[in-house]
UniProtKB/Swiss-Prot annotation:
The modification Phosphoserine is found at residue 477. This is Probable serine/threonine-protein kinase WNK10. ATP binds at residues 96-99, 146. May regulate flowering time by modulating the photoperiod pathway. Residues 480-523 form a coiled coil. It comes from Arabidopsis thaliana. It catalyses: L-seryl-[protein] + ATP = O-phospho-L-seryl-[protein] + ADP + H(+); L-threonyl-[protein] + ATP = O-phospho-L-threonyl-[protein] + ADP + H(+). The gene is WNK10. Its EC number is 2.7.11.1. CDD domains: STKc_WNK (cd13983). It holds the Pfam family Pkinase.
Amino acid sequence: MEEADFVQKDPTGRYIRYNDVLGRGAFKTVYKAFDEVEGIEVAWNLMSIEDVLQMPGQLDRLYSEVHLLNSLKHDNIIKLFYSWVDDHNKSINMITELFTSGSLTLYRKKHRKVDPKAIMNWARQILKGLHYLHSQTPPVIHRDLKCDNIFVNGNTGKVKIGDLGLAAVMQQPTARSVIGTPEFMAPELYEEEYNELVDIYSFGMCMLEMVTCEYPYRECRNQAQIYKKVTSGIKPQSLSKVDDPQVKQFIEKCLLPAPSRPTALELLKDQLLAVDGAKDSTLTASSNTTFKPAMPPQCEYRPMDVEYKKNTSVSICSSAKSSQECALLQTMEVQRVAESTEFKLSGERRDDVAASMALRIAGSSGQARKVDFDFNLKTDTARAVTGEMVEELDLSSHEVTVIAEMIDELIMKLKANRSLPNANSVYQSKDEEAGESMKSEISADYYHRVSSNEGSRLGCCCEAVESLLSSFLDSCSMVSNKQSEDLKTELNVIESQYNQSCQRLLRMKEEAIEKAKRKWMKLS
């Protein structure tokens, strides 16, 4: 390929990009590129700023990945050579190592007959990378380790950990955000209280996939079923397909409960990974170090902290970002209380058709049920998705109704927030005032569906109605119980009719948009 074929140069003139696409992600396209100084091929990761901003949380994850890759240097961690923002083309660019053999998942599917020694070699390299991450001060947790995020050079057998966009720097003793890929997530991740040993659990699932060529929990139909099995300690069916008892025991060791789970260093010393009885010189320097996190008296905020507050959504934010930028990316949320049970549903829109949601149900006993799931905005319905959770979460018919209504409400909020990106900042203060002004019994009952930090509803008309109701309810604190009950009934009817009207309006809006798109597509 001649240099004349290149389509773009970086600001320094060192790297040139070709039009050869190596891969595509949700918001990232990877091209083949060339380093003219070193004379080597590299990967050019190109992300549209507009696409990134439209996907809540992705900007923070991208910042996290760039920040970490700049500071981490290890043979088994993917190298970042250069990164910059292109204001002219409205893009974010990263130059990284090139792995033409792709991910370990694809490589293993392509080469199904592999000697166990090769798999043990890959395992050693992954553990060395994890040992390096976990031995940082403070430790770095990958949180999304899977074979899809591990890359291989087929010519040398070198394996490297990549995709650190969800990694967390542990400034506090335990992290608290539920994030990752369900099939590879440790049980304690769902409890929102975990440390770097969650990566060891994920590594065990990677080992299982490498040995069996099968994705863990393939027998499950949805994420709710995976959640129930993981939190109940039920292992994937594919574990029974591991014939070698020593390999099976090694994998089971990785999947032990967190207090009994070994560290990366301890696994590297396992007899299964021994290289002809030789001692690995790369581990000698830190062989006497343990990495069980201690409990510091206080946590201080730093640029890469995992931000946590009770009853709020959690995200990784750069302290350099303005509050307005973070507000545009924050997760939408719906809360309800019914029959002494608290329901909390949060979600973010990943693209035009997909949304990711997290449901938490807390009973009066203090025990909580949690599940993460995806929602297709074009094909899924709230009732169908909730129906899939009945068996896994042991839901009552009343709970099914409440959750389905919450999903519908969250979808409307996500769609409205997509259409009106600044609505959150305009109306949040009004929501807070409304939440604080609930004095009467009627007000408390009516507003059980509104959270003070929910964000906007469906635009100006919704806020006007809620504002009027809030003012009216404040003036009704002295009415009789009979009048209160009658008024509550009437308000519930009004709310039901109002919500139905809002849903119809949203459907009409979507139909009009689609009609306009089709018209312009025909013209073009």
